[in-house]
Amino acid sequence: LGAAVAHAALTPRKTSAYQPQPDPDRAMAYAEKLSAMIRCDTTSYANVREPEKFERFHALLAGLFPLVHEKLERTDIDGNLLYYWPGRAHDRPIVLMSHQDVVPAEGTWEHAPFSGDIADGKVWGRGASDTKCSVMAFFQAVEELLAAGYEPANDVYIASSCTEEWAGDGAPKLVAELKRRGVRPFLVCDEGGGIITE
């Protein structure tokens, strides 16, 4: 019985035949935003605080995602960002978690690590996959939903630390702030694979 339940839980089901049409202009707009984020060097080092790097990045985010910064409550905890988007209900909040910092760029690169080059259908550079892509995706999704006048069913938090790459205190500070507010997330979306068990 356990195997049958696991199989049923893990087997994808076809939920829709909908296939979005390619939109090259939209894809390029997304690529350009991610490119700008990559060009903003947010390299972090263990126990070295360089707040000016993250202040520049935060200013960039405000320019790229104006509705997020106009409509959501923003809390900055030593460069770690927490945005709050109130929903119609508050019992099943979600947290969209990512990090702003990147590891030092070492070795040989096909494209310069902070070039943000858009080439061969990709955005190149440090943070393209770890994980300014997540920062961009979360902010862009909320930006577009705000533009459409969408109100979430439950509270949404965007949490983004600036010390993840060296296991610093950023994420713990964000968690402490959520706990202080009495937030018990129903769902946390973070980088990495899915977790299907407690």
Task: Give, region by region, the residue ranges found by the protein language model.
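Acidic/His- and Gly-rich active-site-bordering loop/insert found
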Residues: 2-131, 147-154
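Acidic/histidine-rich catalytic neighborhood of metal-dependent amide-processing enzymes
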Residues: 123, 129-198
